[in-house]
Amino acid sequence: MSTSDDIHNTTATGKCPFHQGGHDQSAGAGTTTRDWWPNQLRVDLLNQHSNRSNPLGEDFDYRKEFSKLDYYGLKKDLKALLTESQPWWPADWGSYAGLFIRMAWHGAGTYRSIDGRGGAGRGQQRFAPLNSWPDNVSLDKARRLLWPIKQKYGQKISWADLFILAGNVALENSGFRTFGFGAGREDVWEPDLDVNWGDEKAWLTHRHPEALAKAPLGATEMGLIYVNPEGPDHSGEPLSAAAAIRATFGNMGMNDEETVALIAGGHTLGKTHGAGPTSNVGPDPEAAPIEEQGLGWASTYGSGVGADAITSGLEVVWTQTPTQWSNYFFENLFKYEWVQTRSPAGAIQFEAVDAPEIIPDPFDPSKKRKPTMLVTDLTLRFDPEFEKISRRFLNDPQAFNEAFARAWFKLTHRDMGPKSRYIGPEVPKEDLIWQDPLPQPIYNPTEQDIIDLKFAIADSGLSVSELVSVAWASASTFRGGDKRGGANGARLALMPQRDWDVNAAAVRALPVLEKIQKESGKASLADIIVLAGVVGVEKAASAAGLSIHVPFAPGRVDARQDQTDIEMFELLEPIADGFRNYRARLDVSTTESLLIDKAQQLTLTAPEMTALVGGMRVLGANFDGSKNGVFTDRVGVLSNDFFVNLLDMRYEWKATDESKELFEGRDRETGEVKYTASRADLVFGSNSVLRAVAEVYASSDAHEKFVKDFVAAWVKVMNLDRFDLL
């Protein structure tokens, strides 16, 4: 047993007592605050992807760099790479086409339409957990094969763009005509922390398809991109996989035709790898030893590569021309009878029992094998609805080619937002409904026009609360994950947003603003809605004794109803918006966690979120006009009263019922109820990180700073979808 005497004795001999043990003394080691308090509010999610982690610096302009790219020279190099087989990872049939298609597919396929997160837009396949998912075995090799090309072209092409372009070139080099390619995906430099991949603690934990409809998850098992290719929970039953397939592809916004096209198209080229038992496969890249240099899954089976490669454990080749585009997938699917069998690794798959050996071996030209299929491939034949589509594609290969080209383009561009963000020479001209298209601008308001419109709005009779509320309702639908939503398009005036419960009060201002727009004919309704917020904030600041100019950039347009996919826009309806003290459901997370979620979608920092909530409360912008969180006697005045009164120890807070969603703030001396609040209000006094920010804004010298910070954050939200201003 060590005593204080031991410490003194060690010091006397010239040895530091704290350097004697075997403890990990590196930064970040030891028990963390999250270990002690696992339910701690994730304020850190608002600090992701800062310039401190970006080696290119905040002045780097990817669009500018891309304009210097020899685009077709890059495609030529990618085409050459496809057939330059490397001994450390030999190419099947001398082509990496199937590998690169899978890399692009698995990068894009993490997208979930329910919350807009995931997808290929930031090159996340380079980082954990995706770089080490069980479904991404061997894609580390695909990325490493691309390194010489990335090294050559440097920052003129992002990893995120290169992954998808490599998949496109692989298809084109195999004889397929793609729909096009839009660049513009900017790399980030650390893993996304905000994506909820699920609660499971073990890889490949099975999820019931019904559970996928209740959570923002895109796969039926933890660590898969879509579904288990052996059927749900390794059932081996093609029909049982239909519900899972629909759920997962539906979560990406794909219908049955797109689903069939994507599965069949993705399985027209290449193969799966299951030469031997998966027990021979080593740790994934994140767990691999340092000398592996970021590669993982080293195999001890035979040579570990080429004919001995193990990836999924399945050993399937679908078509007799696995490096050339064809309709053989459907021809084989319906021509032969299929019997269940197992791969050399023991995985469940199907073989065409009555077929001749027509499938070429990937490394020995003298060998042939029978066609094989995944359990989930046969779902396309035996599910009645999928079968109808599959037979149509069987009989009309051109229809299949067109459907796959469009579905592949949608898959690989779904998280990029509107077409205005696409760059490069191969951007398709056609507007697609899932891109949330917008018309061309028809207004170009002058400075005088804007001044006149501001006067008209100010004289309209709308209160500060109404002006601020309508602008927030329009702009706050933006999602940073897939760049959907926002004020541009004025879709607040269209279905479904006009009928959302959260917008019930806000849309009451629309008829007034629509009248101003029609009478002036000088600006779009979208611009006038945002300008209403400008007027409201400036009036509120003036009432607080400050003359503030709120920046305004015209140029928004008004979308039409036929340019608005109602079903897809329903996904933007918030289940909670803590900025407006709105919550529709109590069975999803905590109110304060949902506030963080909303702020993260709006790309806000913790100080920006704090300033906005405090300002929205004193401006009376609650969705239902309630007084929850309105800690002021001067509603409509842009003051720091919210913070001053929240942190005032004269008041003590008690929940109004067992749900602990609403609270009363009582005077400690008189017992009088002074204020009411939600969890989205009290979190700024409860959470230590947010309280630290709130204390800044509550200080006696902070009023002007608070107003300026509120205005800056407000303008940021109003312009989140103004990609034309970048």
Curated annotation (Swiss-Prot):
The UniProt entry annotates the active site at 106 (proton acceptor)
Which BP terms from GO are recorded?
A: cellular response to hydrogen peroxide; hydrogen peroxide catabolic process
- Residues given in the record as heme b binding sites: 267
**Residues involved in crosslink (Tryptophyl-tyrosyl-methioninium (Tyr-Met) (with W-105))?**
226-252
- Superkingdom of origin: Bacteria
Where is the Tryptophyl-tyrosyl-methioninium (Trp-Tyr) (with M-252) crosslink found in the sequence? 105-226
Q: Which organism is it from?
A: Escherichia coli O139:H28 (strain E24377A / ETEC)
Extract the InterPro entries matched here: Catalase_peroxidase, Haem_peroxidase, Haem_peroxidase_sf, Peroxidases_AS, Peroxidases_heam-ligand_BS
The protein's Enzyme Commission number: 1.11.1.21
Q: What molecular functions are annotated in GO for this chain?
A: catalase activity; heme binding; metal ion binding
Protein name in UniProt: Catalase-peroxidase
* Entry's cofactor comment: Binds 1 heme b (iron(II)-protoporphyrin IX) group per dimer.
Q: Which PROSITE patterns match?
A: PEROXIDASE_1, PEROXIDASE_2, PEROXIDASE_4
The cellular component terms of Gene Ontology attached to this UniProt record, alphabetical and capped at eight, are:
cytosol
Q: What modifications follow translation?
A: Formation of the three residue Trp-Tyr-Met cross-link is important for the catalase, but not the peroxidase activity of the enzyme.
The family this protein is said to belong to: Belongs to the peroxidase family. Peroxidase/catalase subfamily.
Q: Which keywords does this chain's UniProt record carry?
A: Heme, Hydrogen peroxide, Iron, Metal-binding, Oxidoreductase, Peroxidase
Q: What does this protein do?
A: Bifunctional enzyme with both catalase and broad-spectrum peroxidase activity.
For this protein, what reaction is catalysed?
A: H2O2 + AH2 = A + 2 H2O; 2 H2O2 = O2 + 2 H2O
* Leading EC class: oxidoreductase
Q: What NCBIfam families does the database record attribute to this sequence?
A: cat_per_HPI, PRK15061.1
Instruction: List every stretch annotated Disordered.
Output: 1-33
Q: Subunit notes for this chain?
A: Homodimer or homotetramer.
Marked site: Transition state stabilizer: 102
Q: Which cofactor does it need?
A: heme b
